[in-house]
């Protein structure tokens, strides 16, 4: 499988057919299409939220274009981030330990918000033949969040000494250098209060997921349910359980497919780390599509090595690129290389390499345009530049 995350704005900027033609040339099998974003706006017609683009049903366009080209279309929803909903329900924002209530992050423990997302997803499934439902931001975003009076009560009900764990978290993030691992070390040595804190956060995330997924399964038993997960949970349970409330083991039982966001450059990591994340994710039991760093900071070489590392793991299901519009793509055809530039910068130079030779080619490929380059050898690597800056490139 080759997946790609896609912002709805891409259709408005480039045109739906051109965008999906580009995906077809890349060999994309699965498109994860942003259907409800961080702003709270939606890419489809619903009474529950305003549209991203007035007068256009971008989800309908995307489903039609994907199916016409034999691709699967997954409706992608940002879960616990919704600026519009928090503006209407300010008391439901996620509460920071020292800074107070967020104006854009929703508390994932709020049943009212879970029901809202359930209803949004139900609207999509009732009106559109999407192939999947994809949940993102299915988490607390940091251990410093989740400290309202209601949150403290939830931790107490789980059996935690809420005052003690709050003080331990404060010590970890605002104490001295020697305290930087205090709460995580407590988890690892089996501190019952810290374990209860983690359990409460995991349960809140799982309850949110269950509310949405049960409705989706009832409406469409054949639907593919997937989630984008933070990468640390594949190998560091203390970190993921406490920070995010994400348990790969438990979420893997709820979803058909998980997408660990193994964005190597964002974490200062290499391709070996991508393989480590993929290997840990595979153990959770769900199908794994590893999310790769294909946006600013990545290059043709880093993406190639990350993809090889992910695909080299036994049991891995494929890769998913973040995101359409941030990298150049190319397809090898008989005697030529077909290059597409969906980015917002001019491509000025390409480097094409095979086993025995490398060619640097001066090229001018404006945003949204294509170019064909004659080929006389087998290509295995593509790199691209915009003036002095190297940009990401994907070679099919």
Regions found by a protein language model. Name each.
Residues 11, 72-128, 145, 185-187, ...:
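Active-site-adjacent "subsite" loops/lids of carbohydrate-active enzymes
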Residues 254-273, 277-280, 288-331:
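Substrate-binding cleft of secreted/luminal carbohydrate-active enzymes
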Residues 30-32, 58-99, 132-139, 222:
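Glycine-rich, aromatic-flanked loop segments that form ligand/cofactor-binding clefts
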Residues 5-7, 74-79, 134-141, 168-183, ...:
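Aromatic-lined carbohydrate-recognition surfaces of secreted/lumenal glycan-active proteins
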Residues 377-396:
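Terminal connector regions
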